[in-house]
Amino acid sequence: MKNRSYEYDVALSFAGENRAYVERVANSLKTKGVKVFYDLFEEANLWGKNLYEYLSEIYQNKARYTVLFVSSFYNKKLWTNHERVSMQARAFQESREYILPARFDDTEIPGILKTIGYINLENRTPEELAVLIENKLKKDQTFFKNRWSKLSTMISPKPFIFTIKVVDEKSQLVKHAKVVLVANNSTYLEGYTDENGLAHFVIRTRKLYTVLIAHSEYPAVVFKSMNPKEDIEVTIEKTNNSGSVIINKSGQIPGISGKIEPVLKSDKNLSVYADNIAIEGGKDQPYDFELNKSIVLEDNKGNIVHLTFRFYQARIALIDFYRGRSM
């Protein structure tokens, strides 16, 4: 089967525990003349390469389709999650199906909706699945023959994946940290670190970003003028009774009831409103504050929190907090 636009007709993404089944699929496809990316077919080619970058390119740009073999093992693997994120970056860009789920079980995969059509592998042999993949490719070849010239003018520039890894001072993974990328034009992307301490972002425009990281048990982190062309690893150190939070427009601070709303006034000064919260012993609101200078808040239950704003732009605030003693 000829493939004029892609290096591979299909790439296979799977957990190692399912290799026996997937290998039979790969061998069956190969005998049919399908150009299939299967890792054991590529051992010599993969030898010595930066696999993080190379596999991202394969699953994002070099295959016409990817078959994602869903199983309970898939979510637990670092490499399969990297492959999935690369696939999804491509899927976001295109209006047609690109990720083809094949399910060993009902495991939920982030970003793969249950409403997406899938193949149930429970009573299907690897050879039968290979026939389905071949039929899918044949239909797609006809579509691209008639439509490629039109589609090529509609597809936007290639997005790419930017990944931030967050660890603590003991090199332990930090899960559920909020990460926000604020562009120099004040647009932003936001996400959270996953079970592997990773936050992935699909970057579609070439801009510099300020990277904000917050977690309820760790202090705030700010990196300014960051070019997302290379992934980064960030180490944060836990401190007692303190943490950080990122709020958009308004939000709550852990350890105190009520909401706060920082604003940029017409005179370019920063101020904050607090709902049912006293600021600095009951000063008038909005209360003017400065970045990197602490202010004291107290709620109606006597809970006290010391706040330090580290960043404010586009209604997004990065805040360190320290829990004081209740009165």
From Swiss-Prot:
<dbReference type="Pfam" id="PF13676">
    <property type="entry name" value="TIR_2"/>
</dbReference>
<dbReference type="GO" id="GO:0016787">
    <property type="term" value="F:hydrolase activity"/>
</dbReference>
<dbReference type="GO" id="GO:0007165">
    <property type="term" value="P:signal transduction"/>
</dbReference>
<dbReference type="InterPro" id="IPR000157">
    <property type="entry name" value="TIR_dom"/>
</dbReference>
<feature type="active site">
    <location>
        <position position="229"/>
    </location>
</feature>
<comment type="function">
    <text>NAD(+) hydrolase (NADase) that generates 3'cADPR, a cyclization variant of cyclic ADP-D-ribose (also called v2-cADPR). Also cleaves NADP(+), but does not cyclize the product.</text>
</comment>
<keyword id="KW-0378">Hydrolase</keyword>
<feature type="site" description="Important for ADPR cyclization">
    <location>
        <position position="218"/>
    </location>
</feature>
<keyword id="KW-0520">NAD</keyword>
<comment type="subunit">
    <text>Homodimer.</text>
</comment>
<protein>
    <recommendedName>
        <fullName>3' cyclic ADP-D-ribose synthase AaTIR</fullName>
        <ecNumber>3.2.2.-</ecNumber>
    </recommendedName>
</protein>
<feature type="region of interest" description="TIR domain">
    <location>
        <begin position="10"/>
        <end position="120"/>
    </location>
</feature>
<dbReference type="InterPro" id="IPR035897">
    <property type="entry name" value="Toll_tir_struct_dom_sf"/>
</dbReference>
